[in-house]
Amino acid sequence: NNSRKTLITNVVRQSEHLNTILNINYSYLNVLAQELSKSQDLFSEDNVSLIQAFMHNTDLNRTAIIDPNGNALYDNEVIKNVAHRRYFKESMQSKQSLSDPLESSVDQQTRVILCVPIFRDRQVIGVVGGSYNVTKLGNMLFDDLFEGQGKSFIVDQGGNLITRNKQYEKKHKLNTVDNLFNVCNQKKIKTDFKNQKSDLVLIQTKKKESLYLAYSPLKINDWMVGYIVPVHAAQESYTFITHYETLLATFLGLIVLSLIVYLAHSSSRENKYLIHLSEIDPLTSVFNKET
């Protein structure tokens, strides 16, 4: 039905939107990488100033320049070695990379590292990366859809939650759920996740509540964007929208009809006036001649 179509359409659009946001941040990093490559010393004071300014003017939280040995110099001038990290290894192979999510023990926010290679004369001379708050990214989803009665999230191919809303989980007693497949263990969902396909399925909770689950691939790291909403909420919302659209169409129809009647009436009055003018015009001519 139409509420199902609305859900699928929205989850696909949101997936495309998030993909665009991440790609914009990759673009920022690529521009920064070009500037960093101009200095013979990757860890020069000018480059440190560059990444500090970059961090303050983008949504990336922590920025680092990484040399070929994996030594990372951060914007706060702390140095760590990340040679063992997948994102570093992939970027050293001329690839853009996105790390696995990490939850901060300080603010419980989930962050990922976006990394791009630094080129000079077509050779990779290092890596530049920045951390991005995916919890914040996830909270941007579906804020106004179905009056906030549903919940959006990002999961990996294995169903592990990447973004989560602690307040929502506490309200609905979902704080122990770490994997989507623990809630809805349908073969179709797992197959669609593996094949990176969009769809919508009906699931039943242990409390016999019917829910719609819509999902679509994010096209980065095999992640999926998901949205779950009670069936009654989706259907009620669509019924309201349909009723509203019917009222609006009726109102516009009445306006058009009134306009047609008005124009017809105006045309009739104008015709009568022209006839009246044609009757007095000869008299006027005669009157003008007599004067």
Task: Tell where the protein language model's regions lie, with residue ranges.
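Conserved nucleotide-binding and Mg2+-coordinating catalytic segments in signaling enzymes
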Residues: 274-291
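Solvent-exposed, extracytoplasmic
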Residues: 43-59, 90, 119, 123, ...
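Extracellular/periplasmic juxtamembrane segments that couple receptor/chemosensory ectodomains to their
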Residues: 178-246
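Cytoplasm-proximal transmembrane signaling helix
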Residues: 232-274
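Juxtamembrane extracytoplasmic/periplasmic/luminal helical "stalk" adjacent to the first N-terminal
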Residues: 1-42
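Extracytoplasmic/periplasmic ligand-binding sensor regions of membrane-associated signaling proteins
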Residues: 68-144
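Extracytoplasmic/periplasmic sensor domains and loops in membrane signaling proteins
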Residues: 48-50, 75-103, 168-202
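Amphipathic coiled-coil signal-relay and dimerization helices
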Residues: 66, 70-77, 160-165, 214-215
